[in-house]
């Protein structure tokens, strides 16, 4: 019989100091990069996302040395949907989630192979780029022009984004993915920013949280996606007034019971310790939450045998909740965990490496411009 909410709350470990079993979580993420259990088979087309949870989790635990970085980088580049020689598929470029289509292995920047069903997926492009930066790659083999062209093709007239060019649901999740892609590539030509901002603004609900779209229910995940997107754009305080931001802060801070839930009257769930916690961090009021209750709830979902975190106590751990549980603990500066960048959802070490990359691109572009001017004169 499933545990009631009261039983879950009672089992949250409040009042006792629970240990964070770092080494077991390292081994859990290692296994996620190898052979996955049968129950993960339906996620084969999203394997790159599972790799992101594992790699970023290891990065947060300062344990990337346990993986073969070069092999994984080659695998990720083999998932890049590259332009064909005639560039007829430019609006389909990005990263796919795995090799399920049987496209020839091609980790280079050579022209892609035409396939009628091959296209990038917006979430896979986001996680693929994130993984490359996490692993220390310089993104030199990323066809940035093609990724941005593929991204532009996914934006709808209302400012939201689809996941794939054939069409799919369109909501705040993919606005966030698009914002991360543009931020990582240091090029916002991949979207009509004004339309995206309008979409985020119209998604504010009557109770002051953000929904997946206009007229829908406020949700902790979509509130994070909207607020984080605006922070990456550098537009948060331009879009919402101080009064509106205070209302959003109140909605978010009311999501804490012991851990956090995503909507009123819903059970708490490990992943919202990041989704809502990171939003509060971006809004600069995370320090007013109850760290002890949140920590105890997260650790009550820790699998003490195999590592990882579940959404609820006494449930099976999975890659998503394992990663976001660690990120939630990072927001509270748990010992043994690196700091997380609350908007980009990677370690601050990785975000700083990305800024160094941006600076090197800028220096390279300036040098090329100077050389071109010198040649023309």
Curated annotation (Swiss-Prot):
Signal peptide (residue range): none
Cellular compartments per GO CC: CAAX-protein geranylgeranyltransferase complex
Binding residue positions for Zn(2+): 269, 271, 321
PFTB repeat locations: 144-186, 193-234, 245-284, 291-333
Keywords on record: Magnesium, Metal-binding, Prenyltransferase, Repeat, Transferase, Zinc
Cofactor details (free text): Binds 1 zinc ion per subunit.
Record's subunit section: Heterodimer of FNTA and PGGT1B. PGGT1B mediates interaction with substrate peptides.
Protein name, as recorded: Geranylgeranyl transferase type-1 subunit beta
Species name: Homo sapiens (Human)
Recorded name of the encoding gene: PGGT1B
């Amino acid at each position: 019989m499933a545990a009631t909410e009261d039983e879950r709350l009672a089992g949250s470990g409040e009042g006792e100091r629970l240990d964070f079993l770092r080494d077991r979580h390292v081994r859990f993420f290692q296994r996620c990069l190898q052979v996955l259990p049968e129950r993960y088979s339906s996620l084969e087309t999203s394997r790159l996302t599972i790799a992101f949870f594992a790699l970023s989790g290891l990065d947060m635990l300062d344990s990337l040395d346990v993986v073969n970085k070069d092999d994984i980088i080659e695998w990720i580049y083999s998932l890049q949907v590259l332009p064909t020689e005639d560039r007829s598929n430019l609006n389909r470029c990005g990263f796919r989630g795995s090799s399920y289509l049987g496209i020839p292995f091609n980790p280079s920047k050579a022209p892609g192979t035409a396939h009628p069903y091959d296209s990038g997926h917006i979430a896979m492009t986001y996680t693929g780029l994130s993984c490359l930066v996490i692993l220390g790659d310089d993104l030199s083999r990323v066809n940035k022009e093609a990724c941005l062209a593929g991204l532009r093709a996914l934006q709808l007239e209302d400012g939201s984004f689809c996941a794939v060019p054939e069409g799919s649901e369109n909501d705040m999740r993919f606005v966030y993915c698009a914002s991360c892609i543009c931020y990582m590539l240091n090029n916002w030509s991949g979207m009509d920013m004004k339309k995206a901002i309008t979409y985020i603004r119209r998604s504010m609900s009557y109770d002051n949280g953000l929904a997946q779209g206009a007229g829908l229910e406020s949700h902790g995940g979509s509130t994070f996606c909207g607020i984080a997107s605006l922070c990456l754009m550098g537009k948060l305080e331009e879009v919402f007034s101080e009064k509106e931001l205070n209302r959003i802060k109140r909605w978010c801070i009311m999501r804490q019971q012991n851990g956090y839930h995503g909507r009123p009257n819903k059970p708490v769930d490990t992943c919202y310790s990041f989704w809502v916690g990171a939003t509060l961090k971006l809004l600069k009021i995370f320090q007013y939450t109850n760290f002890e209750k949140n920590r105890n709830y997260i650790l009550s979902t820790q699998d003490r045998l195999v590592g990882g975190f579940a959404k609820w106590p006494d449930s099976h751990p999975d890659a998503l909740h394992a990663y976001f549980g660690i990120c939630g603990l990072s927001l509270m500066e748990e010992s043994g965990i690196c700091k997380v960048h609350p908007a980009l959802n990677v370690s601050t070490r990785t975000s700083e490496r990305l800024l160094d990359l941006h600076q090197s691109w800028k220096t390279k572009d300036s040098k090329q411009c100077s050389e071109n001017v010198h040649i023309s004169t």
